[in-house]
């Protein structure tokens, strides 16, 4: 295998303009991303809505998993179908229409908020919601085992007569899977492995309400994206399966600046998050090749170099070619020469780090607005769902009582109880770390709820009981 950058692909996909058309001292490309390499489901513009509530995503997530499409959910069209199905007096028919409107519509939008109805959700007006649903399906690796569990849960749902009538009239059918473009690239593998276990447990145990599913998606949206941001900043030295601890505080506890939740949580991650648009563009640049079937990220480049599939020096030379063409096209920034020398795992990794630095440097100096609009799509989700302002200590990842109960249910699953120290390990498998002060307060919380079997003062002999 030989890695080759295709200049014509770059020029076409990045809307390159020659100096015959525009000044050499101007920006002569569009900073394209999400075409040849799909990293995050965001757009670098202010028109694209920010999704902060994962409850909006639940229906589209299930629909995407099942590859299901509903027919038109417009109320006026639905009641015409109902009228053809039901033989009753017109006066009673009008009452039936009113009941359908009350039960299944809110502000003109069809409501699908249980496992029996999710697949019949109409098309969303918010394309950001649809993109996020597809992204989560891809990066959390929804497979046939999960699809089977969803369909089994649907079969067990006790549909009432009115729901059955509406479903019959909406007539949702599976769509043909004719997707030709690649899905989102999975940078961090561990999130999908744990998600599968938790999602199937919830489906099998009846935790299928929209609030529970929203909590699950919020947790794994956080887990995947936070770890991915960190892995990306390690370039070719990143590890797809290695978690970086990110510490949380309990909602009701007081914190100080020297606590892990302040030093080792959002304070660490926020710097990584600021780089995601530059990573998206860099990876798009690296994938301007004649092979559109395989996406290559930083780790994959290093793997191919290490196993001898691609030549290190030749590949590094190709990437330096990308840098030259790219920096030449960004004619309104003149200080690329000030970027310091890089170190890396191999010559290819060094060249990639240098290319990224070129992309990021011009964003923070010339095009900060575009960068911020992209990055804020993720930051605003964190801020709305997971961060709490601790005044002098700043923003800190936060767990509410509801979050704790939910995490504990996922951790214990079908067991009757779990050792307290093992419970903390289960939290960590889902990306949630607590320091010793938080662990002591959490132990007190479980005691107040009568959830703790205290066999001795030793943590090894304390068990948290299953939540019914």
Segment roles from a protein language model:
Residues 376-403, 444-468:
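Charged low-complexity interaction tracts in eukaryotic proteins
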Residues 399-416:
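Positively charged, polyanion-binding regions of nucleic-acid-associated proteins
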Residues 1-108:
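Charged, amphipathic alpha-helical stretches
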Residues 77-257:
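Long, mid-chain structured domain cores
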Residues 313-398:
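Long, low-complexity, charged/polar intrinsically disordered regions in eukaryotic proteins
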Residues 207-338:
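Long, internal scaffold/assembly segments composed of regular secondary structure
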Residues 432-445:
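Short amphipathic alpha-helical interaction segments
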Residues 416-430:
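Short acidic, hydrophobic short linear motifs in intrinsically disordered regions
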């Amino acid at each position: 295998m030989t890695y080759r950058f295709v200049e014509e692909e770059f020029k076409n996909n990045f809307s390159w303009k020659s100096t015959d058309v525009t000044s050499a001292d101007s920006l002569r490309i569009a900073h394209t991303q999400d075409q040849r390499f799909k990293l995050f489901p965001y757009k670098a513009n202010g028109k694209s809505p920010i999704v902060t509530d994962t409850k909006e995503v639940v229906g589209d997530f299930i629909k995407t998993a099942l590859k299901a499409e509903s027919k038109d959910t417009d109320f006026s069209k639905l009641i015409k179908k109902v009228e053809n199905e039901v033989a009753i007096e017109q006066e009673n028919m009008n009452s039936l229409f009113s009941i359908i409107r009350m039960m299944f519509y809110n502000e003109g939008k069809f409501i699908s908020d249980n496992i029996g109805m999710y697949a019949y959700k109409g098309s969303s007006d918010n394309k950001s919601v649809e993109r996020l649903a597809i992204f989560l399906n891809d990066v959390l690796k929804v497979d046939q085992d999960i699809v089977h569990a969803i369909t089994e849960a649907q079969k067990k749902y006790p549909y009432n007569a009115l729901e059955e009538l509406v479903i019959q009239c909406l007539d949702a059918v599976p769509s043909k899977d004719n997707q030709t473009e690649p899905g989102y690239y999975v940078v961090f593998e561990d999130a999908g492995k744990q998600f599968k276990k938790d999602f199937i447990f919830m489906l099998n145990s009846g935790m299928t309400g929209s609030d529970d599913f929203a909590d699950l998606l919020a947790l794994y949206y956080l887990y995947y994206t936070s770890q991915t941001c960190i892995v990306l900043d390690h370039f070719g030295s990143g590890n797809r399966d290695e978690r970086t601890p990110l510490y949380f505080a309990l909602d009701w506890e007081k914190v100080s600046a020297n606590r892990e939740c302040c030093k080792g949580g959002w304070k660490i991650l926020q710097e990584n998050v600021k780089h995601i648009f530059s990573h998206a563009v860099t990876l798009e640049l690296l994938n301007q090749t004649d092979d559109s079937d395989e996406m290559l990220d930083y780790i994959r480049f290093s793997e191919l170099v290490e196993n001898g599939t691609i030549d290190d020096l030749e590949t590094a030379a190709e990437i330096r070619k990308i840098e030259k063409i790219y920096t030449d096209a960004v004619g309104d920034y003149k200080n690329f020469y000030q970027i310091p020398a890089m170190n890396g795992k191999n010559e290819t990794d060094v060249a990639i780090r240098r290319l990224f630095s070129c992309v990021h440097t011009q964003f923070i100096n010339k095009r900060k607005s575009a960068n911020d609009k992209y990055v804020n799509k993720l930051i605003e989700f964190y801020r709305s769902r997971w961060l709490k302002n601790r005044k002098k200590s700043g923003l800190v990842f936060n767990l509410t009582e509801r979050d704790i109960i939910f995490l504990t249910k996922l951790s214990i699953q079908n067991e009757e109880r779990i050792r307290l120290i093992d419970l903390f390990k289960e939290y960590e498998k889902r990306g949630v770390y607590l320091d010793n002060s938080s662990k002591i307060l959490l132990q007190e919380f479980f005691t107040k709820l009568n959830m703790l079997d205290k066999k001795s003062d030793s943590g090894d002999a304390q068990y948290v009981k299953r939540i019914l």
